[in-house]
């Protein structure tokens, strides 16, 4: 279910402050965050976020196509190892 339009998009305040602080400086560093729920704003473009996936921080470089999505969409939490191999082929 989508968020109500009257509420507007959500972004954590501490994350927005970190982005605004880096916009003023020349050197851009990786911004480490646990806020997977934050919406990507247009002023995030060009920044790299280290988004926590429950195990480690995954680097996510924000491009123009990502605006409006959540940070957590680009850091998957589950790793799929594949289904078990079929033993019928090895028995022949």
Swiss-Prot record:
What GO biological process, any one, is recorded here? ribosomal small subunit assembly
Its domain of life reads Bacteria
One Pfam annotation reads: Ribosomal_S19
Q: Which residues form a coiled coil?
A: none
GO cellular component terms attached to this protein's record: cytoplasm; small ribosomal subunit
State the encoding gene. rpsS
Q: Which InterPro entries match?
A: Ribosomal_uS19, Ribosomal_uS19_bac-type, Ribosomal_uS19_CS, Ribosomal_uS19_SF
Q: List the protein's name.
A: Small ribosomal subunit protein uS19
Question: Which species does the entry assign this protein to?
Answer: Staphylococcus epidermidis (strain ATCC 35984 / DSM 28319 / BCRC 17069 / CCUG 31568 / BM 3577 / RP62A)
PANTHER family on file? RIBOSOMAL PROTEIN S19P FAMILY MEMBER, SMALL RIBOSOMAL SUBUNIT PROTEIN US19M
Keywords annotated in UniProt: Ribonucleoprotein, Ribosomal protein, RNA-binding, rRNA-binding
Primary role? Protein S19 forms a complex with S13 that binds strongly to the 16S ribosomal RNA.
One GO MF term on file is: rRNA binding
The family annotation for this protein states: Belongs to the universal ribosomal protein uS19 family.
Q: Which HAMAP family match?
A: Ribosomal_uS19
Sorted alphabetically, which PROSITE patterns does this protein's record hold? RIBOSOMAL_S19
């Amino acid at each position: 279910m989508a968020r109500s339009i009257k509420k507007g998009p959500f972004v954590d305040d501490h994350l927005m402050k970190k982005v605004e602080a880096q916009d003023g400086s020349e050197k851009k560093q990786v911004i480490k965050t646990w806020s997977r729920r934050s919406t990507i704003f247009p002023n995030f473009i060009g920044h790299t976020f280290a988004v926590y996936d429950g195990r480690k921080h995954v680097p996510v470089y924000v491009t123009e196509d990502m605006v409006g999505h959540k940070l957590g969409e680009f850091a998957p939490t589950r790793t799929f190892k594949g289904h078990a191999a079929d033993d019928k082929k090895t028995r022949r």
